[in-house]
Amino acid sequence: YGDIEPFGQKLIKTPNLNRLADDGIKLTQHYAGSTVCGPSRASLLTGFHSGHGSVRGNPKWTNSGNPVDLSTNDTTLAHILKNNGYNTAIIGKWGMAEQVPTNINAMPNAQGFDYFFGYKTHVAAHHYYWPTLFENNNEYKLKDNDYLKNQGKYTHDLFTEKALNYIVKQGETTQANEAGKQPFFLYLAY
């Protein structure tokens, strides 16, 4: 987490991030909840140690035969923020909806996120030219993508575009809202 100036990096100046850190909260005790991505993401979003969470490993199927999905009983950071008036979004790698066909209850929209664009499984996220992403609960086809040949639309570029569009849209929504500003939370997971 030391990649930006508020956390000790001295080479690149980040005055806006410095101000954000000074006016907000610096989270310094959470680097990785696990050695692999699924349980680490679940720990980040639920606050549970990976030993107490529903996602404990990265394999598509556990020894019990059940897929590694985030439990519908888990309260996520997005739930808490949404219940406090935030618009919430995740763009990028979700990696906690492994069932085929998709368990809608494990998708981000059922886990407190108003908007989702990205990979639903951790396996797909290991290929940057994957042919199918998800926008909310719907498949988003990239017909020219071939992950075996690394051809088509580079998904991280698409995530960046979607994230920038989301931020601009939230700014426009805030300006149009006469009652006041609606805060937003964007979880951008490359």
Question: How should these model regions be labeled?
Answer:
Residues 1-190:
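Formylglycine-dependent sulfatase
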